[in-house]
A protein has these predicted regions:
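Helix-turn-helix repeat elements of alpha-solenoid scaffolds
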Residues: 208-214, 245-256
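Terminal, low-structured helical/coil segments at or just beyond the last alpha-helical repeat
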Residues: 298-344
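Amphipathic alpha-helical repeat scaffolds of TPR domains
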Residues: 222-244, 265-286, 316-336
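Sec-dependent N-terminal signal peptides
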Residues: 4-13
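Secondary-structure boundary elements
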Residues: 43-136
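Active-site neighborhood of thiol-dependent amide/isopeptide-bond enzymes
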Residues: 115-173
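Alpha-helical repeat scaffolds
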Residues: 249-257, 287-313
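Hydrophobic/aromatic-rich core segments of domains that either
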Residues: 148-216, 227
Length: 344
């Protein structure tokens, strides 16, 4: 056990020593360290910064925080604040949330009369390029999908001090905020940005085939706290690392484990942790000639614990039916936007 923890503690430190030359892996270690400091309270918690760091690491530092991220977000904030005042949305308790939604889905001078719409090119690809889900890309192209659009909304909400949270469905995320203006019969607004709809909870549960247990334990349909949101971004950092280098290793294990300290009901993080342990075990046994010593036994024990914890999330496996429904819903939403909004 001691050898394992020594390895895990030294792993990021050893990489950071190499950071003077900044290899591709070093950008990930740097991003991890900064996110970890946010979660530990050693640095200011910033969802905007956390999202940027994951994208910056993937691009190996070729993404500027000010010019590629902050400047555009600040410009959008200025427009939304003006929109909020001019349209007297302060008369609503959720007026700022309404202003953010309007900016994203409707044509106004502030978005160049080009709303942020679903990126349908991803449907025709056998494998979606990882960067297609980046917020920095959506800010530039006004095209996004079920990750980048709600994450952009969450960043704007945080910057504008509007109460709104990310929530998950299987392989999907959306926005939740309390319906303080009683617009719907439910306590929470479930805002689906890919289809420009407010969806009732029962419909999300049915459409994504979510079981009661997954809702009860907080895996799906549960608003994330800001700390959980940054922890979720840390798990995404590990996924980006795996996508870029095509491997699970000590970094992805450490990244997922740190994320799970703050957001335990993230099935993706448990999957990353399990696959990373599997790789670590295989490599260790290859070095020892498949001798299962105390260290190997402990690694296997960690793997068993990981599987048990994953099972407790009651994750829904995405089916072809779910994928096809999401595709059709997005197509119908795009048709509505083209006919009812863009044609104005």
């Amino acid at each position: 056990m001691r050898r394992l923890w020594l390895y895990l503690l030294l792993f990021p430190l050893q990489l950071s020593v190499k950071a003077q030359s900044m290899t591709a892996e070093d950008y990930y270690v740097s991003a991890f360290n900064e996110m970890s400091d946010m979660l530990a309270g050693r640095d200011t918690l910033s969802i905007k910064r956390a999202v940027y760091l994951a994208e910056w690491a993937f691009y190996e530092g070729k993404l500027d925080y000010k010019t590629d991220f902050c400047d555009e977000i600040d410009r959008i904030k200025t427009f939304i604040l003006s929109f909020y005042e001019v349209n007297k949305l302060q008369t609503y308790k959720t007026g700022m949330q309404m202003a953010i939604s309007s900016y994203i889905v409707s044509p106004y001078s502030g978005n160049g009369y080009t709303p942020y719409t679903y990126d349908f090119e991803t449907f025709s690809m056998d494998k979606e390029p990882w960067e297609r889900q980046f917020v920095s890309r959506t800010l530039k192209t006004h095209k996004g999908q079920c990750r980048s659009l709600p994450w952009m909304y969450k960043i704007l909400a945080s910057e504008l001090n509007a109460e709104a949270s990310l929530a998950h469905a299987p392989r999907h995320c959306y926005i939740m905020y309390k319906d303080e203006d009683k617009i719907t019969p439910e306590e929470w607004i479930n805002l689906e940005l890919t289809t420009n709809q407010m969806q009732p909870a029962w419909w999300i549960k049915q459409d994504f085939e979510i079981c009661d247990s997954a809702v009860q334990v907080g895996t799906y349909m549960t608003p994330l706290t800001d700390i959980e949101t940054v922890a979720c971004q840390m798990a995404d950092l590990a996924l980006g690392y795996k996508e870029k280098f095509n491997r699970y290793d000590g970094f992805t294990y450490y990244c997922a484990s740190r994320s799970l300290e703050f957001y335990r009901m993230n099935p993706n993080a448990w999957i990353i942790r399990g696959k990373s342990l599997e790789r670590i075990i295989q490599d260790y046994l290859a070095r020892t000639g498949n001798i299962v010593d105390d260290y190997a036994a402990y690694l296997i024990h960690l793997m068993d614990e990981t599987k048990l914890s994953f099972d407790k999330t009651y994750m829904t496996e995405e089916t072809e039916g779910i994928r096809e429904r999401r595709k059709q819903q997005a197509i119908e939403a795009q048709k509505y936007i083209n006919e009812k909004i863009l044609s104005r």
